[in-house]
Amino acid sequence: MTVDTIFAPATARGRAGVAIVRLSGPRAATALTLLAGRLPEARRATRAALRSPPSGPGPTGPGPEEGGEVLDDALVLWFPAPASFTGEDVAELHIHGGRAVLAAVLGALGDLPGLRPAEAGEFSRRAFLNGRLDLTAAEALADLVDAETQAQRRQALRQADGALVRLYEGWRKTGIGLLAHLEAVLDFPDEDLPPEVETAVRGGIGALADALAGHLDDRHRGERLRDGLQVAVVGAPNVGKSSLVNRLARREAAIVSDIAGTTRDIVEVALDLGGYPLVVADTAGLRETSDGIEAEGVRRARARLAAADLTLAVSDGTVENGADDPAADLTGEAVLRVVTKRDLLDPRAVERWLARGALPVSTLTGEGLDALEAALESRARAFFEGDGTPALTRQRHRSALMEARAALRRAAEAPLAELVAEDLRLALRAIGRITGRVTVDDVLDVIFRDFCIGK
């Protein structure tokens, strides 16, 4: 099968000090020689004047004096296969990051025969197909590029380092061992194997199912770390929810008005507290209303409250015994009680609220905001810190493990050894899909389509 040589910027487009253009494929060496005048020593950065290729290169490629227009003064690197990111011949051009320079170099590469621009994620896809990455490592690479907080960075690096694949491959090898023992019973019925073999296999299958169940019972911790802990800010109308969100965001994200019912849709802001990502949602005030649009906002607020990982239940601090305060009805470990208008409270009122477990804040002066942020960070840390095992990071992994767990539980209860073996095979197949041991093109398309072009 003919493999194209692909090229793309590996850095973000736009004005920058340096841009990197990556090439991968069988004509990478030829392209590098044509532009740089020679093939540099492998894995050693070499300075070269990049020139547009001549219309008719000689059999050994042009020398520097034979090339066309100078495009840039660059550093070039050459990574011969298989010791490269993709497992193919790879070249990198480190050029000045101006738009015109990048456009000129990409244009010159596009004029060369056998080269084409890469599709999104195509470099990583080739790395997977050539055995340089498993699927979890490829996904971790995408997560690392997207990481905005330190906790996200640490999780992505841990997954890229193979923490998940080691866990899943360990389970898969355990399952293969169990299947081998079971198939020995099925394939050699006359060998008088002890009956304890099948009993031990069933016990091992049950233990494996329990291990998967424990891994799945994680409150979606890994996915939340990728996407942000969902925090809903709820309460009655006009208690200062939008002002509180604006204070947390350090910007005017939500409209603030003295008119009750101003907020009618969800307004989200992303926060980084102590390296943990939070998505804080300002919601419509909870009340009965005949206004159709406001009623829809209240419905959405209740839906966001039901789906939230953490709730900020906000009340007006100047009203200590509000009979119709919806925030007062919200309790539990996933609720932080917040009262606003601290600047209007005397010290004794502040102490009374604190004694009731509430956090008094002033959105006008910022007083109490540090304590609220510290409480949010503490809740986020408690949510994200696990038992030390790698976290599930994608719904694709979760779905496959749920499928494997169901198959293992069927296997543990199956009346016939043949049925046990079949369900065990299904479980192993599901686990193998996570790392790419078992895969189909449709799965690869979904995984790699959201990558950067140069990844």
From Swiss-Prot:
Protein keywords: Cytoplasm, GTP-binding, Hydrolase, Magnesium, Metal-binding, Nucleotide-binding, Potassium, tRNA processing
Ranges in coiled-coil conformation: none
One GO cellular component, as annotated: cytoplasm
Binding site for GTP: 238-243, 257-263, 282-285
Record domain TrmE-type G: where: 228-381
UniProt cofactor(s): K(+)
Region (Disordered) location: 43-67
Disulfide bonds: none
Location relative to the cell: Cytoplasm
Keyword Protein biosynthesis included in the entry's annotation: no
Binding locations of (6S)-5-formyl-5,6,7,8-tetrahydrofolate: 22, 92, 132, 455
One Pfam family named in its UniProt record: TrmE_N
InterPro entries cross-referenced by the UniProt entry: G_TrmE, GTP-bd, GTP-bd_TrmE_N, GTPase_MnmE, MnmE_dom2, MnmE_helical, P-loop_NTPase, Small_GTP-bd
Binding site for K(+): 238, 257, 259, 262
Cofactor binding notes: Binds 1 potassium ion per subunit.
EC code(s) of this entry: 3.6.-.-
Positions contributing to Mg(2+) binding: 242, 263
Gene Ontology terms, MF aspect: GTP binding; GTPase activity; metal ion binding
GO biological process entries: tRNA methylation; tRNA wobble uridine modification
Metal-binding as UniProt keyword: yes
UniProt record similarity statement: Belongs to the TRAFAC class TrmE-Era-EngA-EngB-Septin-like GTPase superfamily. TrmE GTPase family.
Subunit text: Homodimer. Heterotetramer of two MnmE and two MnmG subunits.
PANTHER family noted in UniProt: TRNA MODIFICATION GTPASE GTPBP3, TRNA MODIFICATION GTPASE GTPBP3, MITOCHONDRIAL
Record's function text: Exhibits a very high intrinsic GTPase hydrolysis rate. Involved in the addition of a carboxymethylaminomethyl (cmnm) group at the wobble position (U34) of certain tRNAs, forming tRNA-cmnm(5)s(2)U34.
Stated name of the protein: tRNA modification GTPase MnmE
Organism per entry: Rhodospirillum rubrum (strain ATCC 11170 / ATH 1.1.1 / DSM 467 / LMG 4362 / NCIMB 8255 / S1)
Lineage: Bacteria, Pseudomonadati, Pseudomonadota, Alphaproteobacteria, Rhodospirillales
